[in-house]
């Protein structure tokens, strides 16, 4: 909230399970705020060093060695090296060792991991060229305004902190695509220079042109980097083509005909460690007391990295205090889904989180995030008293209004019938509770406030969203909770390696093919295959048990 320069609610035309608030953050404001928090934290010493190796004895880490030869000892260590392990930057036929442009990689740490038996692989990500905002013809682009009444991320935020800036949209065109096709020979992605696999869901522009040859344009979001910078981030044209080609690509796009490239785009290859070698706490199974988080675990994206850093930090601290691991499960958080996917399924490309990865995403809406997780955070010592008291107040109001809406009745008297008719609603033929009325598709809280003057009016927007979604989708939410409970019972049942599922009646051929392709080792893993239902899991469980009985009879 402190660094936001644009709030925007996403997927507002879709259901609440896939809606979310996105902010465009001012990089400098965000950085200075975080530095302030870190700098003012008690018992925290900040050192700027390069780590050359980790110190291990009897498969247990006890410290790190810096590039200055210093040895720093600790009971637990968290490593979040990003794209720096063996980082290699590509721009056309030019390549140089770096974790980020202008910053050297960490080579020794990768070698250290390999020597200690960690399974090290190679991935790739990329970044677009940065543009000068003063060289863009904004009139030729589509404006995307910020929300005028946004939802904040923190209880403490009462007002918008900064001037809100618009983003803009433009598109590639056939000329752009032609330039890219003519220069694919100079792309390290297609010449074989880049060995690492890139992210499927945010590919480079050259990758898009090849993979989606039928598309005659691709969307580009022109995003401001901050309030006091001229840099624009053209989200959608990540590239590793030579700089002269990048300029041609940019200048072929509507509104960017005269745009100046401040910094070129590039691809970066880096080492990562197989996340299947981690526990759910993000502690290594191979090296005790070593915790890994972020791109080193095969993920891509800021939120994905932050989520892992949080869990690794919690568990590293708890291990120092000999406390049990803190694990979030799949039905209570996206963090739980992210980590469970990484550890049970592994990665063969950079992993990004989507709502579609959640089996029970109606339980994981952003309007109920505080209801799901604040108590856990407070118990861990991560939520301050002020925020916790705000949460308790909201929870108390929620329980009060759920009860109120279930018991407050609207009668079919003459006045109410007229109101319903004037609002274009179906005729009120009998007495209904407010809760029953709110379940109707065309009735929301604003409608209820018009229907009856003596209804207790709610003013807390976040609580209104929570109540409305919990009431409107109560049946679906209840069903997903039941499904999650059933899957919990199944999850540890092992699937025999040689189980022949081709004869299972009740499973579609499509599901059989998916199971054969993924080859899950437990029903818990099978439950995460797209399209698998609790009913299908039940059929699979019955078949496994039948198979075991038949084996015992032989």
Where are these regions (language model features)?
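Glycine-rich phosphate/pyrophosphate-binding beta-alpha loops
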Residues: 295-303, 359-361
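Internal hydrophobic alpha-helix adjacent to the cofactor/substrate pocket in enzyme cavities
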Residues: 305-326
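An anion/pyrophosphate-binding glycine-rich loop and adjacent beta-alpha core
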Residues: 111-247, 255, 344-417, 425-441
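Conserved N-terminal/central alpha/beta ligand/cofactor-binding core
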Residues: 1-53, 80-97, 104, 108-110, ...
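A glycine-rich dinucleotide-binding beta-alpha-beta segment and adjacent secondary-structure elements
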Residues: 233-299, 327-340, 462-514, 519
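Extended, charge-enriched "interface" segments that sit outside catalytic cores
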Residues: 357, 374-536, 540-554
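Glycine-/small-residue-rich beta->alpha transition segments that form the dinucleotide
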Residues: 76, 81-85, 241-242, 254
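Core beta-strand elements of the Rossmann-like FAD/NAD(P) dinucleotide-binding domain
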Residues: 67-76
């Amino acid at each position: 909230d402190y660094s936001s320069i644009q709030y925007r609610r996403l997927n507002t035309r879709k259901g609440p399970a896939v809606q979310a608030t996105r902010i465009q953050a001012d990089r400098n404001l965000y950085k200075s705020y975080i530095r302030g928090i870190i700098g003012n934290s008690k018992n925290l010493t900040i050192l700027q060093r390069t780590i050359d190796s980790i110190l291990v004895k009897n498969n247990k880490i006890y410290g790190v060695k810096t590039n200055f030869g210093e040895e720093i000892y600790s009971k637990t260590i968290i490593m979040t090296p990003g794209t720096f392990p063996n980082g290699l930057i590509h721009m056309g036929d030019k390549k140089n060792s770096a974790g980020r442009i202008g910053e050297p990689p960490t080579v020794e740490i990768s070698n250290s991991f390999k020597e200690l038996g960690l399974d090290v692989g190679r991935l790739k990500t990329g970044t677009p060229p940065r543009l000068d905002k003063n060289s863009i013809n904004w009139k030729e682009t589509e404006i995307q305004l910020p929300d005028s009444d946004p939802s904040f991320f923190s209880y403490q935020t009462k007002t918008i902190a900064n001037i809100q800036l618009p983003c803009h949209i433009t598109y590639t065109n056939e000329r752009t695509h032609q330039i890219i096709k003519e220069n694919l020979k100079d792309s390290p992605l297609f010449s074989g220079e880049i060995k690492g696999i890139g992210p499927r869901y945010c590919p480079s522009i050259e990758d898009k042109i090849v993979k989606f040859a039928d598309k005659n344009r691709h969307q580009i979001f022109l995003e401001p980097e901050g309030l006091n910078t001229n840099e624009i981030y053209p989200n959608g044209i990540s590239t590793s083509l030579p700089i002269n080609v990048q300029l041609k690509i940019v200048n072929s796009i509507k509104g960017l005909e005269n745009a100046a490239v401040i910094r070129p785009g590039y691809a970066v290859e880096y080492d990562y460690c197989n996340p299947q070698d981690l526990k759910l706490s993000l502690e290594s199974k191979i090296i005790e007391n070593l915790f890994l988080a972020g791109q080193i675990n095969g993920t891509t994206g800021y939120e994905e990295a932050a989520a892992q850093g949080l869990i690794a930090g919690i568990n590293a601290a708890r291990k120092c205090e000999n406390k049990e691991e803190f694990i979030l499960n799949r039905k209570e958080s996206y963090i739980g889904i992210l980590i469970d996917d990484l550890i049970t399924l592994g990665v063969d490309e950079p992993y990004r989180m989507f709502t579609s990865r959640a089996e029970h995403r109606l339980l994981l809406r952003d309007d109920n995030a505080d209801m799901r997780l604040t108590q856990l955070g407070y118990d861990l010592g991560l939520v301050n008293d002020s925020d916790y008291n705000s949460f308790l107040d909201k929870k108390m109001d929620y329980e009060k209004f759920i009860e109120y809406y279930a018991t407050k009745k609207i009668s079919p008297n003459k006045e109410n019938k007229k109101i319903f008719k004037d609002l274009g609603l179906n005729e009120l033929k009998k007495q209904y509770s407010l809760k029953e009325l709110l379940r109707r598709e065309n009735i929301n809280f604003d409608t209820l406030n018009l229907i009856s003057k003596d209804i207790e009016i709610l003013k807390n927007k976040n609580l209104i969203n929570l109540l409305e979604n919990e009431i409107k989708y109560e049946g679906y939410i209840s069903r997903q909770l039941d499904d999650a409970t059933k899957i919990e019972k199944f999850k540890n049942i092992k699937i025999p390696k040689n189980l022949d599922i081709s004869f299972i009646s009740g499973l579609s051929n499509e599901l059989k093919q998916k199971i054969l392709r993924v080859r899950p080792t437990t029903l818990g893993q099978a439950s995460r295959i797209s399209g698998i239902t609790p009913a299908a899991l039940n059929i699979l469980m019955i078949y496994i048990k039948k198979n075991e009985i038949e084996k015992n009879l032989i």
